[in-house]
């Protein structure tokens, strides 16, 4: 969860303990990573006091492909930290579209599916 305003700061949001456990879990063998979250860094609901630390943590995951968020309810793709990691935001269902991602051996692609 990256929606910090849902908590009274008694629990860290994002949960860095969870991220650390995921990074250190040697029983999981995966070659690529996609990070999904509600609110992305820079959002008014993200604890922006820790956005740089969050970015440092997620950069450690194996072959990070991209990050996906939905809080803004609009299509967005941005390199928020100028480090090559793209944050993709999707619309809400009222806008009658969604993102379809395809992961390939050479990277990833996405398309906006309208319905």
Which ranges hold each PLM region?
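His/acidic metal-ligating clusters that form di-metal
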Residues: 3-82
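Binuclear metal-dependent phosphoesterase catalytic core
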Residues: 75-115
């Amino acid at each position: 969860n990256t929606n910090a305003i849902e908590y009274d700061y008694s629990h860290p949001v994002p949960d860095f303990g969870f991220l650390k456990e995921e990074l250190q879990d040697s029983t999981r063998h995966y070659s690529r990573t996609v990070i999904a979250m509600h609110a992305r860094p820079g959002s008014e609901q993200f604890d922006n006091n820790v956005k740089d630390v969050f970015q440092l943590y997620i950069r450690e995951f194996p072959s990070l492909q991209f990050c996906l968020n939905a809080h803004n309810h609009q299509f967005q793709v941005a390199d928020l930290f100028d480090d090559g990691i793209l944050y993709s935001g999707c619309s809400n269902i009222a806008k009658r579209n969604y993102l379809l991602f395809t992961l390939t051996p050479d990277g990833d692609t996405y398309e906006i599916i309208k319905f």
